[in-house]
């Protein structure tokens, strides 16, 4: 293991490029020389080995003569899954505990081990279940994994999934958020010893289990170890066999429509159960949460974005005020369709009018809107889906900032199975699906980001329909094959990602503007000559008359503009690391300054920004001050 590190360092010192292909050659050569299994020298073990030597054997590490610049290059070589922080932020997804859902959609899975619409085999869900759905434990596990893969974790976006957030009790909401912040504030990163596969160079899988008994006492942070024991003592299972058997009887009844998901969840997780006992201490006050938030303003791992998901009918001024106090900056909202007939026959229990109101309220409160849009619903057609999505992207009442657009999946236990068996629903063919998605990409405007085109379901869980995880790549190939010169403008396609950007070539594009029923929106973006995007800002100029007429519902007044998002791309760099990433060249500050000029010229007296907890200090340095739910600046 050490020799591979030394070989990489020597190559870098000679000015050579060590890409993945070159690294594989180095690993294979060293495996042959040592007569070792190349899997024991895999890339995923190199960085933890380097980190352990630097931390625990400083004299040995000093002998490698690694200065700051050489270490930066080495980490670029060893970093696993570099795209995870390519957007400039390290993302941690956490899942709330199973809970009754206010909806009952026809296509929705009914996995009793999960909150509604999620499956226990999804990666984030499996991690959550192994961590008892505890927010502190989930963050600790992901923070550890990101650190061991070499990712910077100064700037964290927390994504809280689990169905309709507002369905949970307010005390649980405050506790869940408080524990997310607490884990980051505590720097709850486990040592290398906590992962026996990474603890020692050359370890085999057979030896990994035995190392657990030899791990140092501080392998897990004390809070993590103590909390795991608390759940174990309460009778909360983490063993797969126990988890499966614990819900088996209820799951069978739900799958054959004898009793519903909500009734079963109450029996499994309500009073008189181990989860009922745990629920007694899963509550916090807003004061406790705000204490953790204040600490996080200057913590090692700062929250620069916080996302919850909800339904349009749950979006009210009161709900938005609460989630803003919790620290949220973005809302994921299940829309699925704008066709009222499709909404009705798929039993969404919402109206298009409710969707319109939810978008207007969310915008006026300053939230980023991340919508879910589903193709191939019961009753849908490919041409109808194309028209519906185009309306969603071009009609002012909607026009989300970000979207997950994915095909409906047939999951065992959902009520859609009966429709399939009766011949009332069929999945689109691959050709139909690619055709719809290719058209959807083309009509997606420059201010919108398509974050996903497929749910993270295991192919084993999908009964029929698309099971290919590389659906986006197939869609992009379809677009290229069309040869019609269609331009893709959506954000994700244009992100500079892990590549750098020549800052001298960047220009500030202010041409993207659009009207909604309640705001005039401006999308400012730093772009390369090729149209790649290095950063952007979302500026809302609210309709003064509307704000004045709804003053009792809104937290702002009519002469206040709103910055809803500032994002600068490039590999996430650690605080104080003056590397070449676009984030370190004042692009964000220049965007904010220009937004202030535009708002002032439009006649607004003040400008608000929906700051995350961990970006408050940044905006204070730019002249903003704390003001209610936002930070504000006089214009």
Whereabouts are the PLM-identified features?
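Flexible, acidic/Gly-rich N-terminal and inter-domain linker regions that tether
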Residues: 1-138, 142-282, 446
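Conserved non-cysteine loop/helix-boundary elements of the Radical SAM core domain that shape
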Residues: 120-138, 158-182, 196-370, 374-431, ...
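C-terminal scaffold of the Radical SAM
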Residues: 184-185, 277-283, 314, 318-324, ...
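Non-catalytic positions within long, well-ordered alpha-helices that form the structural scaffold/packing
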Residues: 324, 393-396, 596, 600, ...
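Conserved acetyl-CoA-binding loop-helix of GNAT-fold acetyltransferases
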Residues: 579-598
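Conserved GNAT acetyl-CoA-binding A-motif
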Residues: 597-611
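Conserved active-site alpha-helix within GNAT-family acetyltransferase domains
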Residues: 611-630
């Amino acid at each position: 293991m050490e020799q591979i590190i030394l070989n990489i360092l020597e190559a870098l010192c000679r000015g050579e490029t060590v890409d993945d292909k070159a690294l594989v050659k180095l690993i294979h050569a060293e495996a042959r020389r040592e007569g070792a299994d190349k899997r024991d020298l895999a890339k995923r073990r190199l960085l933890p080995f380097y980190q352990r030597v630097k931390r625990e054997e400083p004299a040995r590490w000093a002998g490698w003569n690694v200065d700051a610049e050489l270490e930066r290059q080495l980490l670029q070589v060893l970093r696993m899954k570099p795209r995870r922080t390519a957007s400039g932020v390290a993302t941690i997804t956490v899942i709330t505990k199973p809970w009754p859902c206010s909806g009952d959609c026809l296509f929705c899975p009914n996995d009793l081990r999960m909150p509604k619409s999620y499956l226990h085999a999804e990666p984030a869900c499996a991690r959550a279940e192994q961590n008892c759905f505890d927010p502190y434990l989930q963050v600790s596990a992901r923070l550890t994994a990101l650190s061991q893969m070499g990712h910077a974790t100064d700037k964290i976006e927390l994504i809280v999934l689990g169905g309709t957030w507002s369905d949970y009790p307010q005390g649980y909401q405050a506790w869940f958020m408080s524990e997310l912040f607490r884990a980051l504030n505590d720097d709850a990163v486990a040592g290398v010893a906590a992962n026996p596969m990474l603890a020692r160079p050359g370890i085999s899988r057979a030896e990994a289990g035995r190392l657990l008994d030899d791990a140092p006492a501080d392998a897990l942070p004390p809070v993590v170890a103590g909390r795991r024991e608390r759940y174990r003592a309460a009778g909360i299972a983490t063993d797969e066999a126990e988890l499966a058997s614990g819900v088996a009887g209820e799951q069978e009844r739900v799958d054959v429509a004898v009793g519903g998901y909500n009734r079963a969840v109450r029996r499994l997780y309500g009073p008189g159960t181990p989860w009922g006992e745990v629920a007694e201490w899963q509550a916090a006050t807003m004061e406790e949460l705000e204490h953790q938030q204040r600490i996080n303003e200057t913590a090692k791992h700062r929250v620069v974005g916080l996302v919850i998901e909800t339904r349009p009918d749950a979006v009210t001024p009161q709900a938005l005020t609460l989630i803003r106090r919790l620290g949220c900056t973005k809302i994921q909202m299940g829309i699925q369709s704008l066709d009222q007939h499709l909404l009705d026959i798929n039993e969404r229990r919402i109206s298009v009018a409710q969707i319109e109101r939810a978008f207007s309220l969310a915008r006026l409160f300053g939230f980023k809107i991340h919508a879910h849009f589903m193709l191939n619903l019961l009753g849908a057609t490919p041409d109808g889906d194309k028209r519906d999505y185009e309306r969603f992207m071009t009609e002012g009442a909607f026009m989300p900032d970000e979207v997950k657009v994915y095909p409906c999946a047939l999951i065992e236990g959902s009520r859609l199975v009966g429709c399939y068996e009766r011949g009332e629903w069929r999945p689109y063919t691959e050709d139909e699906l690619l055709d719809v998605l290719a058209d959807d990409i083309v009509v997606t405007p420059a201010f919108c980001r398509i974050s996903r085109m497929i749910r993270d379901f295991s192919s084993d869980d999908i009964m029929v329909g698309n099971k290919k995880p590389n659906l986006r790549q197939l869609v992009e190939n379809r677009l290229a094959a069309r040869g019609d010169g269609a331009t893709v403008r959506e954000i994700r396609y244009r992100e500079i990602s892990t590549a750098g950007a020549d800052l001298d070539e960047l220009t500030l594009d202010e041409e993207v503007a659009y009207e909604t029923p309640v705001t005039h929106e401006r999308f400012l973006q730093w772009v390369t000559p090729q149209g790649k995007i290095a950063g952007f800002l979302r500026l809302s100029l609210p309709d003064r008359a509307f704000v004045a007429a709804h003053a009792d519902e809104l937290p702002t007044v009519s002469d206040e503009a709103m910055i809803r998002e500032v994002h600068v791309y490039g590999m996430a760099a650690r605080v104080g690391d003056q590397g070449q990433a676009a984030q370190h060249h004042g692009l964000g500050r220049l965007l904010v300054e220009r937004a202030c000029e535009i708002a002032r010229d439009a006649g607004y007296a003040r400008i608000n920004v929906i700051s995350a907890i961990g970006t408050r200090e940044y905006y204070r340095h730019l002249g903003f001050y704390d003001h209610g739910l936002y930070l504000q600046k006089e214009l």
